[in-house]
Structures are given as C-alpha cells and as structure tokens.
C-alpha cells in the first residue's frame, strides 16, 4: 500500500526548490502517494495538477502563521498523511509543530538557510534560532550541499543531518538532443554574445547587480546582450534599472518559461 506523503513548499511559482519538487515527484514509484501543500498558487501547482497530483493551496506569506494551523491540521487528517516533507524554512515553520502534535514524522529539506550575512545581527540570530527549532522538530534534516550542513553546524549546532546534493534532470537537460534556436524570438543576432539570467526576480538573486554588470560589460564589448527570464517581487525595480541604464534594446526580459533547455 502506498504511503501518503505531504510535500510542503512555500510557493507554487517555479524556482529552484519548486523545480526540485517537480523532479522529485516525477521520480516516485507506486509506493508513494504524493500530496502537495503550497502557500501560493502558480505554475508549479498547475503542472502538478495536470499530472494528476493532488494539490492544496493555503494562502499565506508568513512563517509560523498560527492563523492557518487549523486548516493545515484538518487537511493532514483528512488526507491520512503518514509522512511530511517540508521544503524550505517557511514551509517547515508552518507544519513542524502540527507534525509533532499529531506524531507524524517530518523530513526537512534545507534549500538554503533563512539567515545570511547581509542581515542585521538581531535578524540573523532570530532566523538561526527558528532554524534550530525546526531542525529539532524534524525526524530528519536533508541539506542539499555540504556547505549548508557546515553552516548549520557552526551557526546553531546542527546535529542530525544528511547531505543529498541536487541533481540535474538528464532527460530534460540532455545535451545530445535537438534544441530550438530562440535568438530570433528575442531579437538577437548570431553575432550577439548573450548572457542569461534564469530564476526568480528576487533580492537573493541580485537582479539589479545583473543589470548593472551588463551595462558595465557593454562598455568593453558592444556584442554583449542579455536575456532575463523569470518573475518575482523585484520585477518592476529590475525593469526600472534597465531603463535607468539605457539597456532597453540590449536586455530582453521574459516571464517564466518551461523551455529552459532551449533558452540555455
């Protein structure tokens, strides 16, 4: 009989963790019945629904959001969940205490810690403390790199964890297959040297630095142009930066696309 596994993730848009989840679920056999809980809708949820995967969306943008506790608890009981797999700290924070109360084991995959060096001392300590709590409430902690595990050990004494590095979907990213030439679609010539940015347009990805770097690079070589593919909460700021640097003709933008191998 299949195990009912609740895969929890903070957003339904397509990003690194979300792409990982798509590939993870695609690799499950009939011993696992995945059910997805996301805290926003988006392309990932649409793609999983089309595959026949049951998906639930409980809207929130906050970690440790007690307002949705009852709704999540009812969902877990209704779906007879036997294992919870949380991707990222925000997702884990909203299910960790519920999992412990219901005596359901939780696996926490760290797709990068919520604390980093650019935060104030207080915020960084608070985030590290919250990560420590989440890890203590988890049956197992998976780090996607040895670097992440070492950071956890040094920052808050992470004890029980394993490293499972992210892989590449060789069916999708197969260098031996034919790819579409998208240069004409984006207005690039064969002589253009195109630099790509594919990902969420958020602070962590530094899209403003990308725009600035392209402007600086073009001072050295006019063949350099750029393609920026993605969506996020810094879209308008990024478009404004493109205008300020006078890069409208040299940096093309596109929302999320499913044909990333062709784009690359």
Predicted feature residues:
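Active-site donor-binding acidic/aromatic loop of nucleotide-activated sugar
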Residues: 234-237, 247-258, 263
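Short amphipathic alpha-helix
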Residues: 7-11, 15-30, 38-47, 130
